[in-house]
Regions:
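Solvent-exposed loop/turn segments at secondary-structure junctions
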Residues: 166-170, 209-215, 238-243, 275-279, ...
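Catalytic His-Asp segment of secreted/periplasmic serine-dependent ester chemistry enzymes
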Residues: 274-350
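Extended beta-strand solenoid/passenger and fiber regions
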Residues: 1-136
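Short, solvent-exposed loop/turn segments at secondary-structure boundaries
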Residues: 173-179, 243-248, 281-287
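Serine-esterase "nucleophile elbow" of acetyl-processing enzymes
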Residues: 131-206, 220-228
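Structural recognition of the beta-strand scaffold that forms the well-ordered cores
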Residues: 159-164, 168-169, 203-208, 230-236, ...
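Active-site segments of SGNH/GDSL-like serine hydrolases
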Residues: 235-239, 259-292
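Catalytic-core regions of hydrolytic enzymes
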Residues: 174, 200, 207-231, 241-254
Length: 350
C-alpha cells in the first residue's frame, strides 16, 4: 500500500493535537482527550466536510467537550444506533452486516466492516489548554534491537516484515477501505515514520491475514518465514483472547520466533500487544489484552522488544470513548487507532 507521512497524535512542544478522532453521541456531545483552549479545525475527511464553530458546534475554552448546535451538519451516534432492533438488524456474517450478536446485554451491537465509522466520526485539531501531561511511550531498553538501531543510525536500508490478524492486514484504515483520506495501515505509517526520522529507506512487507490467530503463523510458515527482512513484527492477540490462555499464547509466539531464527539468525523482533476489544461485545472478562501483553514481556530479550499498544489505547479511551477510536464497532481501529499503533512502534526508537 502507498505510504503516507506519519502524523503524530500530539505535538509535545507546542501542545497541539492533530486529527484526533471524535464521535458525537445522541445527546450531541463529544470528548476531547485533553482540555482545549481553541479548536483549530473540525472536519470529516471521508465526507470532505469542514465544520464551523458556532454554526455546527460549540466549545468553551478550557473545556474538553464539544456540543452540537441544533441543525448541525455533524453526524452523531445514538444509543438506538449502537443497539439496533434485532428484528431489522443485519447480523454478521451477513455481507451487508450492520450489527453483530453477543453483546453483554443480549442485544445486537453496531458493526461495520465498511466506512460507516469513517463517515460518522469527525477529526479535531486543537490547542491544548494549560500544562498537559501527554502519555509517555515505551522505549527500547539500552542495547535492545542493536542491529536495526545501528542500521537506522547509519541510514542503511531497513526492511520490515509484519505477520498478524485483520488489524495488521489493514482493517479499517481508510487506505485499506479505499476511501478518503486514504490513511495507510499502521505498518506503513511505522515505516514512513522511521524513514523520516532516520533519513534512510525503510520498507515494509505485510503478510498479515484477516481472521487468523498466532497458531496460523506457526501452521503455515511458508507464508512468511522465508521472506528476508531485518525486523519481524508479530502482531496477534485479538483472535487469540478467547481461544487460549496467555501462557500458551507466549509459547506459540516463541515457536514463531524460533522458526524465523532457524532461517535468518540475525532477525530482530517487535512483539505487538493488541488493542482491547469493545467491552460492550462478547463474553470475555476484562483484562485479557493486558494479560497477553504481560505474556509478551516474558519473551523480551536483546533481540525482541514488546510494543504495548494496549496501554496507550486504554489510556486514550479512558479520556474519550471506544466509538471515537474504532473502525468497525467491536475490534478494529480507525485511522486514529492505526496512528496510535504506529505511535507506539515509533516510540520504541525515540
Amino acid at each position: 500500500m502507498k505510504s503516507a507521512a506519519f502524523i503524530p497524535l500530539w505535538e509535545r512542544k507546542n501542545g497541539i493535537c492533530r486529527s484526533e478522532s471524535l464521535m458525537f453521541d445522541g445527546e450531541g456531545r463529544a470528548k476531547l482527550l485533553f482540555p482545549a483552549s481553541k479548536i483549530l479545525k473540525l472536519c470529516n475527511p471521508t465526507l470532505g466536510k469542514v465544520y464551523s464553530e458556532g454554526r455546527d458546534f460549540t466549545h468553551t475554552p478550557g473545556s474538553d467537550e464539544l456540543r452540537l448546535v441544533p441543525g448541525s451538519a455533524i453526524p452523531f451516534l445514538t444509543e438506538a444506533m449502537i443497539h439496533p432492533d434485532p428484528a431489522t438488524a443485519k447480523l454478521y456474517p451477513h455481507p451487508e452486516a450492520d450489527a453483530i450478536a453477543d453483546s453483554v446485554n443480549g442485544r445486537p451491537v453496531i458493526f461495520s466492516n465498511g466506512d460507516f465509522f469513517a463517515r460518522t466520526q469527525v477529526e479535531a485539531d486543537y490547542q491544548t489548554a494549560g500544562i498537559v501531561e501527554f502519555p509517555e511511550l515505551p522505549r527500547l531498553a539500552p542495547g535492545q534491537l542493536p542491529r536495526i538501531t545501528a542500521k537506522l543510525r547509519e541510514k542503511k536500508p531497513v526492511k520490515l516484515l509484519l505477520i498478524g490478524d485483520s488489524i495488521s492486514e489493514g482493517y479499517n484504515a481508510t487506505g485499506y477501505l479505499k476511501v478518503p483520506p486514504f490513511m495507510p495501515p499502521y505498518i506503513d505509517l511505522f515505516a514512513s515514520g522511521l524513514t523520516e526520522r532516520s533519513g534512510g529507506p525503510v520498507t515494509a512487507v505485510n503478510r498479515a491475514v484477516n481472521g487468523t490467530g498466532c497458531r496460523h503463523a506457526r501452521k503455515e510458515p511458508e507464508r512468511w518465514a522465508g521472506e528476508e527482512a531485518d525486523l519481524l513484527v508479530i502482531a496477534y492477540g485479538m483472535n487469540d483472547f478467547g481461544g487460549m490462555e496467555p501462557a500458551e499464547y507466549a509459547s506459540v509466539i516463541r515457536e514463531i520466533m524460533e522458526l524465523r531464527l532457524g532461517r535468518f539468525p540475525e532477525t530482530e523482533f517487535i512483539l505487538v500487544g493488541s488493542m482491547p476489544r469493545n467491552l460492550n461485545w462478547g463474553s470475555l472478562p476484562e483484562g485479557r489484552a493486558e494479560a497477553f501483553v504481560g505474556a509478551l514481556r516474558g519473551l523480551e530479550s536483546e533481540k525482541a522488544a514488546a510494543a504495548d499498544v494496549c496501554a496507550l489505547w486504554t489510556r486514550v479511551q479512558a479520556g474519550k470513548d471506544y466509538y471515537s477510536m474504532t473502525g468497525n464497532g467491536v475490534n478494529h481501529p480507525n485511522d486514529y487507532g492505526h496512528r496510535l499503533y504506529a505511535e507506539v512502534l515509533l516510540g520504541l526508537f525515540a
